[in-house]
Amino acid sequence: MTEPITIGVDHGYAAMKTAHCSFPSGLAEYEHEPYTQKNVLCYDGKYYVVGSGRQPLQKDKTADENYYLLTLAAIAKEIAYRNAPTTTPVILAAGLPLTSFGREKKAFRAYLLREGKPVSFSYEGISYETSVQDVKLFPQGYAAILQHSDLLNEPSVILADIGGWTVDIMRLDNRIPYAASCRSLELGMIRCLDEIAEQVRRSLNLSLT
């Protein structure tokens, strides 16, 4: 039996990221097979071009199948990068916003786990028969600072995780997160770029694309 591999996936509003790949969080559905296999996911008889455009903002990522489909693409990319068998089972590691971690944890875990049942799909013409055996969830940003022992020795540290849609802020006192200081602000890069484009349009009557 093939041993499972652990794959970390960042389900961003702007991009999906793993240790070895990154692609826009866009998804375009096609009724028939597209003319190319590049970035094409086939699941449940439907075709999707992964990384096409940008997802409309949805605060609840479990509201539809889009982020699950993007996760399948991320799994395929990681399995291919590691030259692992296409039947390799997977343990997923993912993050959730600091302020909604407890509230969203159960639903997001079930959304990704799918009861650990086998899942069949193809990506870029290669067939995969895998399963998600476990899902481990962590507060966004916190894992990153644990790699910097010099910062952890500070009596107080402010962590700012700047993402596509949100900026997550956490204070650590003597290595321990101070829960009351956690904030998730809708001031990420998407909002920033949209605001810049709007100001340029108003001031210069130019459109940034």
Predicted regions, residues:
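Nucleotide/phosphate-binding catalytic cleft detector across ATP-hydrolyzing
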Residues: 1-159, 174-191, 203
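Ser/Thr-glycine-rich phosphate-binding loops at phosphate-binding pockets of nucleotides
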Residues: 162-168
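A short helix-loop
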Residues: 171
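A mobile "lid/hinge" subdomain adjacent to the ATP/sugar-phosphate binding pocket shared
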Residues: 200-209
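P-loop NTP-binding/switch modules centered on Walker-like glycine-rich loops
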Residues: 196
